[in-house]
Amino acid sequence: MRLLHTALLLIVLPCSAQESVTSYWSGALSPTSIHIRARLSGPTDSVRVLACAPPCTEEIASPYTVADPSADLVAAIELTGLQPGMPYTYRFEVNGVQDASGIAAGSFTTPGFGAASFSFVTGSCNGSGSHPVWQAMRDKDPLFLLSTGDLHYRDPNSVEVEPHREPYREDVLSLSPMKEFLHATPIAYVWDDHDFCGNGSDASFIGKASAARAYREYVPHYPMHHPISVYQSFTIGRVHFILSDLRSTKTGEEMMSGAQLSWLLSEMLYARDNGLVAAWVTSLTWNSVGYPENWACQPAERSALNDVLFALGVKDIFIIAGDAHMLAIDDGANADFSTAQDLRYHYPIFQAAALARWGSYKGGQFNQGGVFPNPSAAHGQFGEVLVEDNGFDLCITFNGWQTDGVGAECGLVNSYTFCRTPGQILVGMPHPANGDLLCWYAGEQGLMFRVPDGAASMEVEITDATGRLVLRERRAADHGIMLHPLPRLSAGLYTASIRCGSERSVLRFVADSHR
């Protein structure tokens, strides 16, 4: 009898381990890493992810981590050492037993380094994870989902964390086809009001600390900069995504705190100085007038921000907004709220919502298609953004899609394409590890280098668009960050080749006529 009991345990235990992952999703995607959150049916200190790329001859394993009741049994897993531009599948190992059932098996594709083409889907205001809009988005085969808020409509506002956890557990990660979409598509996500602390919620709401805790437990996210707020940034290809949190520090006097505003401007300057187009995610509508629940409620703050961006020469921006339940596109002609109103730069706007909710209009003028509110609560709407990058011009297409309530049709509602030529084009790794060679174009200052440890000298060679040698210099290498001034250059495209010992970095940059 004892032998029979032992045999039964050997049969039952592996099945129990295979079923121990109850929900999961991925996010914080980069060329070499991804974060995964997995909720287990019980506590363990031995859970990890195993991933492979075709032909799957060897697997990459994450470090072991824990699923603890203090974090609602959610394990925070980071998978590193991935290859850029590769499709991966992953599965879980719990307590030494690998899940071979396929029930808990996810997938993602890493982006490439440097100039790269890709696509993503975007939207806000998700009324139901059972809506066919989730399958329609999956059919677009996006690199990731950019969620601009209201991922659920539970409106939690409690000093207790459980009411803020439950919507992730029950509404976001448990319903089909949403959960299958999230198994196959990484997410980048910033909250709005309904998934923060309820309709119209701001910094005064009592549940903000609980919302922050539940978000950090459940959501695979990029690095945070504040104990409560969830503003974050990341770069894919030559697009730098900047996600503003317009709820946790919002007051009757300001949309965002001074600390978040400083962070936002530093991220804009990072994009400007590193040859990137900035994709600014503002969950609330930017270009409305007279509405209390978006940027129209703080016209002075909006004008001041616009003035600073113009003054800093941050010209390559496009804006993605949610909250209003409608599809709409503007080429930037209606996005200028600067004091001078001189339309110095065009900042195109893509208003993409609602994933599954009835329609609404919250202001704004749009000259490239719209406004198109959801015709009914049964209709789903989302945005698709195509990024085409040939290494010089970067062209972006906004496609607005609408589905019916049964998934029979998914039709194109509006579309708009624009192109930009950022001031610098990186070829190779934009974010190498500390100690590696990195170079970027700093405008009138010249070229900036991060010099590898122990380097003795550097050789700089610059050619113009015809291949004519413009500059060749050799100089002693300083430690850390060093500046290499350039001679006055005619406006045009240039290629810089920098050698430092055995390392080489190549970048292309555009010198403007003001140098």
Segments (PLM) and residue ranges:
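Hydrophobic h-region of N-terminal signal peptides that target proteins for export
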Residues: 8-17
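Metal-dependent phosphoester/phosphodiester hydrolase catalytic core
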Residues: 18-426
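C-terminal outer-membrane/trafficking sorting elements
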Residues: 430-515
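Sec-dependent signal peptide recognition
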Residues: 1-9
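Selective for proline/serine-rich intrinsically disordered segments
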Residues: 12, 61, 67, 140, ...
